[in-house]
């Protein structure tokens, strides 16, 4: 009879894998290389994640889950919510994780598996969570625009490290959200 994976050990491996991939990207690294980097064996990774693809999806889902956790703590005003979300996401210590997200997202947009399976959820899950938090007055188009602007500015930031330029664009978008007719 097969043993149920130890969930604490799986979570610890997942945390270690996220840190490893955030530091060095995913690339085409083999399961053996990844296992060695996090101090385990490829068999243990397979035991906990079943396959390389499932391991990669678990990594993406966990990073997204961590980022979405902040939504319930945001103000309901769109401009204030955007500014607070940005203040959370733009922290320098999160940039490796943002780079990891964009690596996975771009590979998924090209149709590469398993990343292609994550792209719809990377949009739909955020929109659904924002709708729950914002309530019935949330404009779905405005929520989608906010997500697109946030991701575009994050991509700009992680690619250029131009904090000042991106911060100016963030402030401009927040100011636009404060104008009459944007809520």
What residues fall within each predicted segment?
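Amphipathic alpha-helical segments used for helix-helix packing
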Residues: 92-120
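Amphipathic alpha-helical interaction segments
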Residues: 12, 54, 80-84, 99-103, ...
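Hydrophobic/aromatic-rich alpha-helical bundle segments in the mid-to-C-terminal region
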Residues: 112-123, 133-183
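Short, basic, alpha-helical segments at the C-terminal edge of helix-turn-helix-like DNA-binding modules
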Residues: 61-67
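Solvent-exposed, amphipathic alpha-helical segments
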Residues: 12, 16-23, 69-73, 100, ...
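Hydrophobic alpha-helical connector segments
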Residues: 58, 69-98, 142-146
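Helix-turn-helix
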Residues: 12, 16-54, 58
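N-terminal intrinsically disordered/low-complexity leader segments
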Residues: 1-8, 181-183
């Amino acid at each position: 009879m097969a043993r149920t994976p130890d969930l604490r050990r799986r979570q610890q491996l997942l945390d270690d894998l996220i840190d490893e991939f955030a530091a060095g990207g995913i690339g085409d690294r083999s399961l053996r290389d990844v296992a060695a980097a996090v101090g385990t064996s490829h068999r243990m990774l397979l035991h906990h994640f079943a396959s390389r693809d499932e391991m990669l999806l678990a990594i993406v889902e966990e990073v997204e889950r961590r980022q979405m956790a902040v939504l319930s703590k945001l103000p309901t005003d769109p401009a204030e919510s955007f500014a607070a979300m940005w203040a959370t996401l733009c922290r320098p210590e999160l940039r490796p994780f943002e780079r990891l997200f964009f690596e996975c997202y771009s590979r998924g947009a090209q149709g590469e598996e398993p990343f292609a399976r994550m792209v719809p959820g990377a949009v739909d899950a955020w929109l659904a969570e924002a709708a729950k938090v914002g309530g019935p007055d949330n404009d779905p188009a405005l929520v989608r625009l906010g997500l697109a602007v946030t991701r575009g500015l994050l991509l700009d930031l992680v690619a250029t490290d131009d904090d000042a330029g991106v911060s100016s664009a963030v402030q401009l978008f927040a100011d636009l959200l404060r104008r009459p007719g944007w809520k």
